[in-house]
Each structure stands twice: as structure tokens, then as C-alpha cells.
């Protein structure tokens, strides 16, 4: 069933580009190393000022962080990078990536990011007292209000995320498949990433156990190493 849905998603994605964008509607290709754990980054972000937007900007701002960017945004970008480094180096995450079959091993990082966001969405009450739908509503309002700080190449992602409630859709298997199809449409080289949903189906319980072991450690890491807004130019 899932294999038939990616062509439809491509049509919907094309249609979404015709929506009134937040700033720009220029398509952007993705690198396989581009992280996709949006929900995790947003939950871990400081919920003040521009930190929610900054928690997503880490994938779109490369190199030294421009001093012209507001300090809370800079700090959130630096935290995003620290979270990614901690995640990529963690033995549990490496174990999860090794569960991915050779066919999709090149995209194991993307798949695990998205799968972990699925488990975060389905196990949300274990990590937040705020209902998920309330959280996503708050996030979308914040992103709209502060979108003028986002780089052009980030605008299409924000537009799609908000219009299609990407974060809320992570609770359902079909939502994860749609997310993978959306990523597939933006990869630099042809792939069948949408079919990667079978990796979640086949390894669901093991991957969920990995996530439930890992995420509390990530939360502790963030709490133990806060980023100061002073000199956050990493």
C-alpha cells in the first residue's frame, strides 16, 4: 500500500509550492546527512523568544553563526548542533542505524531521525505534560510569527510543516511515510526513501526500545550543558 503513495505525495508537494509561502518558494535539495528530527529539537528547545525557530535553523545555517542573528536564535542553533553531535555519536543511535537494511543504509541517519520522532510523538506523555496538539499549535504560531528570521532555504520546509501539520502527523505510520516521501522528493539524487517505511514496520519494537533508552539520556545532556546566549557563535 505505502509504495503507491509517494507519487501522490509528489503531486501534493508540487501543489504545496503554489501555496502562499512564508517568504520564498525556492525548492531546496537535501543532503543525506541533513537531520530530520524536528519534533525532538523543538521539544528540547527553550520555549522563549526565538529559540523554537532557532532549534530548527541548525540544519540551514552552516559555519560560524552570524552575529547579526539575535542571541537567543544563535544559542538555539548552537544547541541544535550539540544535540546532533551527541545523537550521531551515541552507541544506541548507532545500534538503531545498524538495524537498517543495506538497501537503505545510505539514508539510515534520515530514517532513524524520522522514526525517533515517530516514537516521540507516540510516547509523548512520557516526556511532556503539554498535550502534543497543544504543543504543535504553539510551535506553528511561533514559527509563523518569527519566520522573517529564517533563511530563504528554510521557508519551504516551514510552509509545508505548518500547512500539513507535519509534527502532528508523526503519530501515525501513514504520516511517517508521507514525511519520508516528502524528503525523497528533495534529495539530491534519486532514491526510494518512501519505501524505507518497511524498516520501521520490520524493526518497530526494537527501534522503539532504542528510542526509549536513548531519549532520556539526550534530555539529560541538554539539561547538563545549557548554551549561553553570550558568545554563542559556534
Which residues does each predicted region cover?
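An amphipathic alpha-helical core segment
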Residues: 137-220, 224
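Low-complexity, intrinsically disordered or signal/transmembrane-proximal segments
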Residues: 18-20, 28
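An N-terminal structural lobe/cap that precedes and organizes the functional/catalytic core
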Residues: 34-121, 204, 212-225
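Active-site-proximal alpha-helical scaffolds that flank and shape metal-associated catalytic sites
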Residues: 102-164
